[in-house]
Design a protein with these regions (language model features):
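Alpha-helical scaffold segments
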Residues: 2-277
Length: 277
């Protein structure tokens, strides 16, 4: 070897290696483990997906820091999943709610989380415009399944303020004040009322109320459903029948779900109009 090359070798020094962040043994290299002295208060605002996921999984994370982390609208799905598995922290009410409604929470995380929410948290999930439709529907289904076990006062509040689908289920409540509150719900729909009237049971309070309702009793599909309901007051049958178009009267007659009195009322209307049944 030449003297010059030996001098070059002796004069050359290798740059010190930069230490890599600690990793989880035997797992994906992207799953960073935070050092013991990590400042979680700063790291929750980091832009690195790997750091945010590591923060979400850290056992030292507090409720306030978890909520700050969940304020990231672009929080990685991996971070949301890690947070949902973070022990007691993931069971806290506010954290659960924030995980359930976060736009990037995977469905296999959000739907099971929803099942553990409180009644009025479920109501909020179903009402928030930012929540995906399938997540809203899951919240509504859980809420409807709980109706039989929650208090009368809670059902009144739900009847007044919940989504149209939940209010629709409360149309068949055994308490008149709850049924009336559901009927007046701003999100109540004609479809929900017709569905409730066709339930076949539990309409003893609903049918008379709808038959005299200033808004809903004038809808043709509602009138048709009332004519097919055994609980519709007899003094309203002829008026409802008289207001229906001929084609709808014939459809109702063909349905075969009429009481004798309702059928006779419809036939009388057709006869008066000179139309054969």
């Amino acid at each position: 070897m030449s003297e010059s090359s030996t001098d070059e070798k002796e004069g050359w020094q290798e740059a010190p290696e930069q230490p890599e962040p600690p990793r989880v043994r035997g797992d994906s290299p992207r799953k960073t483990v935070l050092p013991a002295d990590a400042d979680l208060g700063k790291l929750v605002h980091d832009s690195s997906p790997e750091i945010l996921t590591a923060v979400a999984a850290d056992a030292r994370l507090t409720e306030d820091l978890a909520l700050a982390l969940l304020n990231h609208q672009d929080l990685p799905r991996e971070a949301l999943e890690a947070l949902s598995k973070n022990g007691q922290l993931a069971r806290l009410r506010k954290v659960r709610m924030a995980i359930a409604v976060h736009p990037r929470t995977p469905r296999h995380v959000s739907v099971p989380t929803i099942r553990h929410l409180y009644t009025f948290d479920l109501m909020q999930v179903a009402l928030l415009p930012s929540v995906p439709p399938d997540v809203k529907r899951a919240a509504e289904e859980v809420l409807i399944s709980k109706l039989a076990s929650i208090s009368s006062g809670e059902r009144v509040t739900l009847a007044r303020r919940s989504s149209g689908r939940v209010a629709g289920a409360l149309l068949l409540d055994k308490e008149e004040r709850i049924m009336q509150a559901a009927l007046a719900n701003p999100q109540m729909t004609e479809v929900s009322i017709v569905k409730a009237l066709k339930a076949g049971h539990g309409t003893e309070l609903l049918a008379p109320a709808v038959a005299r309702h200033q808004k809903w009793s004038y809808r043709n599909d509602v009138k048709a459903a009332l004519l097919g309901n055994k609980d519709t007051p007899s003094d309203r049958l002829i008026h409802l029948a008289a207001e229906l178009p001929i084609n709808l009267i014939k459809d109702v007659l063909r349905s075969g779900r009429l009481t004798t009195q309702a059928k006779n009322s419809l036939l009388a209307v057709l006869e008066k109009r000179g139309v054969k049944a």
